[in-house]
């Protein structure tokens, strides 16, 4: 983690708590509560660092695919707000793309797995819908990022990869 000593003590403590929750892969915790626990005057960097931590996989490489209170969805939510005020910061776009990529692939994989079980058809359909919605969000975010940063090879590579997995056949 980057040097965070310039952040307030409250910001540093909350980020340390977030790091432990992610490390321990706590998928029972409602990560939305972190927004409420944040200091009133939390800095933009604090919010970015929190979103960055939440969209980083824990040591066991487990995805938290919960749509309400899950690590990745909270990261996307935070980054979406940050991008409204700071659209010219490529790191914000990249971190949102990383989180959306995990979510889209995770829900797509879950949908495929559930579709193999006849008694799980309804759940498979729900997961397929989520995968399609998330993949469209991913592709749209990549399009917007490339419009802002047309020479950025990372965004172009991510778009090409996402297009392979979530191209027209996956459109909502």
Residue ranges, per PLM feature:
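Short intrinsically disordered terminal tails
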Residues: 1-2, 169-172
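Canonical positions in the second alpha-helix
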Residues: 36-37, 81-82, 118, 145
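Conserved positions within tetratricopeptide repeat
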Residues: 31, 69, 76, 93, ...
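Charged low-complexity stretches with an acidic bias
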Residues: 74-81, 85, 89-91
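Amphipathic alpha-helical repeat scaffolds of TPR domains
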Residues: 4-20, 39-63, 88-128, 133, ...
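Helix-turn-helix repeat elements of alpha-solenoid scaffolds
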Residues: 18-32, 64-78, 130-137
């Amino acid at each position: 983690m980057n040097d965070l000593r310039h952040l307030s003590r409250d910001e540093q403590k909350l980020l340390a708590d977030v790091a432990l929750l992610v490390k321990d892969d706590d998928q029972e915790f409602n990560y939305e509560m972190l927004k409420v626990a944040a200091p009133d005057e939390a800095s933009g960097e604090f919010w970015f660092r929190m979103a960055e931590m939440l969209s980083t996989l824990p040591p066991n490489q487990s995805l938290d695919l919960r749509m309400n209170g899950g690590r990745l969805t909270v990261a996307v939510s935070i980054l979406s707000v940050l991008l409204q005020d700071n659209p010219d910061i490529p790191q914000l776009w990249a971190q949102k793309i990383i989180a959306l990529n995990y979510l889209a692939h995770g829900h797509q994989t879950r949908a495929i797995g559930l579709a193999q079980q006849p008694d799980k058809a309804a759940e498979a359909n729900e997961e397929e819908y989520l995968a399609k919605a998330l993949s469209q969000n991913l592709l749209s975010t990549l399009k917007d990022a490339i419009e802002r940063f047309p020479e950025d090879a990372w965004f172009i590579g991510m778009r090409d990869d996402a297009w392979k997995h979530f191209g027209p056949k996956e459109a909502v």
